[in-house]
Amino acid sequence: MPSAFGFRFDNTYRRLPEALFSDCLPQPVSTPAFVLFNDNLAQELGLDSEALSEHPEFFSGNELLAGSEPIAQAYAGHQFGSLTMLGDGRAVLLGEQLDGHGQRHDIQLKGAGRTPFSRGGDGRAALGPMLREYIVSEALHALNIATTRSLAVTRTGDRVRRDTLLPGAILTRVAASHIRVGTFQYAAGQQDPVLLEKLVDYTIARHYPALEGAENKALALFEAVMDRQIDLVVDWMRVGFIHGVLNTDNVTLSGESIDFGPCAFMDRFDPNTVFSSIDHQGRYAYGNQPSITQWNLGRFAETLLRMMDDNTDIAIEKATTSLKSFSLRYEEKWRAMMNKKLGLFGSETEDDTLIADLLTWMHAQNADYTNTFRDLIQDGLPDGEQYQSEAFQHWHQRWRARLARNSKPLASSLCLMRNHNPAVIPRNHLVEQALQAASEDNDMTPTHALLQALSAPYADRDSDDRYRQPAAPCEQVHQTFCGT
């Protein structure tokens, strides 16, 4: 039976072996108060949003919801290539909400205090990073990209010490699950085959039920996860999203984007773009995201070798053969995505050159990634000085000739482009301005306005004009920070 607020918890993860989690209560805060509450998401979850919006105590750890059984999850992670034992150092999973369609959603408090995995951390979070996660996750959702969601951001009334004292906050994160590649690395590290098999069976039942009964369930799971990760990174590349800290603990088995600490969106097109202040070597640069995803999947495959085959050599061969297919699978899906961005139906031998030549021109001209593709939807040559060059005009003629050979009319091509090229993204300078106003001036107006613009990213709305403009030189964001 649902509670008075519509919560229907059915907490299956904590029925797994205790090695995978620790019981852990969220730690109370001084004076909880909502700064953001996601009414639409609450309703999707089957919750009474109107009633809940009056009760920040449930989203701060001050009171527990009926049916919640809080835990902190254990996991490991390759962080910039080095394996580390991690776990939820500042997050508490309250439980799993069943919505009206029987779909299961993790409800997690991020910034809820110290846990058994906190090590030297305080377990808390600052307002700015929690607002960033809310903004970016909801923007990705509106862009039709698989992602965790944000139900609320709650001020704690306490201060957290980072470089300076900052207002504290807790994010209520909603996810299909929080099972990560790092979860499997942790389980494999326990040297307990039964534990690993139970985790595999649980993940298949929760996320890939069609695989139940597969002849080689470990290999089948690996390939299914690889397909979802390819779809995810192709979508990131489509909108110029740079995750920034693509460690194995930030790769979900559900295929959702997760953890948005130093993430950013690319303005000027450059495959080498890096924003994260801790990514000194460009490991997680925009153009490296496909290859690092393949690397992360390799670490996932390593955890499953014993289940793929009793013979280690045969298991390695199976995993390697599957992993080698990543590049071809990715290229096919990336090419299909780029064709949609350019309104191309069918396939011609020149298409690859047409795509490559445009990207080369964009890189050389420091062209805005988002606006260039959106400008192509205009009738005739796009407005703007950069489009008057002979090189672009020659490319534009070739492209229009290719559109004329499409199997569908021009109107269909333009519709396809509008649906795959956003007009509005969370531009880094606008996100930073919103976070600064909220953290320093207690002013949420810029955040609300930005969220409104991001709610319909493919629409042409005059009210969104300022959100489409690239940053002025004095507004440019050159680095982002994880905020932990």
From Swiss-Prot:
Span of the signal peptide: none
Cofactors: Mg(2+); Mn(2+)
Alphabetical keyword list: ATP-binding, Magnesium, Manganese, Metal-binding, Nucleotide-binding, Nucleotidyltransferase, Transferase
Active site: 249 (proton acceptor)
First-level EC class: transferase
Chain sites annotated for binding Mg(2+): 250, 259
Molecular function as annotated in GO: AMPylase activity; ATP binding; magnesium ion binding
Catalysed reaction equations from the record: L-seryl-[protein] + ATP = 3-O-(5'-adenylyl)-L-seryl-[protein] + diphosphate; L-threonyl-[protein] + ATP = 3-O-(5'-adenylyl)-L-threonyl-[protein] + diphosphate; L-tyrosyl-[protein] + ATP = O-(5'-adenylyl)-L-tyrosyl-[protein] + diphosphate; L-histidyl-[protein] + UTP = N(tele)-(5'-uridylyl)-L-histidyl-[protein] + diphosphate
Amino acids binding ATP: 87, 89-90, 110, 122-123, 173, 180, 259
EC identifiers of the protein: 2.7.7.-, 2.7.7.108
Family: Belongs to the SELO family.
Free-text function comment from the UniProt entry: Nucleotidyltransferase involved in the post-translational modification of proteins. It can catalyze the addition of adenosine monophosphate (AMP) or uridine monophosphate (UMP) to a protein, resulting in modifications known as AMPylation and UMPylation.
HAMAP family per UniProt: YdiU_SelO
Name of the protein in its database record: Protein nucleotidyltransferase YdiU
Species for this entry: Alcanivorax borkumensis (strain ATCC 700651 / DSM 11573 / NCIMB 13689 / SK2)
